Amino acid sequence: DGFFEMNINEIAKLANVSRATVSRYFNDGYVSAEKREQIRKVIEETGYKPSAQAQMLRTKKTKQIGVIIPKINSESISGMVSGISKELKQAGFWLLLANTENQEREEVEYLKLFSENQVDGIILIGTIFTPAHKRALRALQVPVVVLGQKLEGYSCVYQDDYLAAKESARMMLKDAKHPACLGVTKRDHAAGEERFRG
């Protein structure tokens, strides 16, 4: 027995039903219990799986999520990407990774690219949000989640850098016998400014 790719016509023939009935079966339309069982049996016996392209055309879903990161050589970011990848895989999605090398313009370009290539959603681990970022985000037709920063109007997952720095300084000063120093930089727009304020 040679391997051959099944199609809807062959399933209909083997199940002794019409092509339209098989189509309704795959599109969750009405099919009698008897015919539904015949089709299910053929699918099970042949190991048929609809092609990803056919499913995408039917459902308008790609099962792909674009993930935009500022740099790949960061332990914290690689840890986030690993966790995102694991969760997406368990949910049946593919991860498309874009590394921007801390280039704000690249982040905006990837937002546009992912939008044009019909991903089902975007996860953005951004550095700073410029007016160009905000325009690109507003133009998106897919859900967006921002990680690491708070951006009004979007679903965000972030830590309170201001409070974390304030509490760290308070705890250090409480037990300090000598003047303490806590190093932060304002140059890190994503977290540094809030930590400096704290």
Regions found by a protein language model. Name each.
Residues 1-6, 45, 86-91, 139-146, ...:
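Bacterial carbohydrate/catabolite-sensing allosteric modules
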Residues 44-82, 91, 101, 113-116:
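N-terminal helix-turn-helix/winged-helix DNA-binding helices
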Residues 96-104:
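Short beta->alpha junction loops
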Residues 1-63:
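N-terminal helix-turn-helix DNA-binding module of bacterial transcription factors
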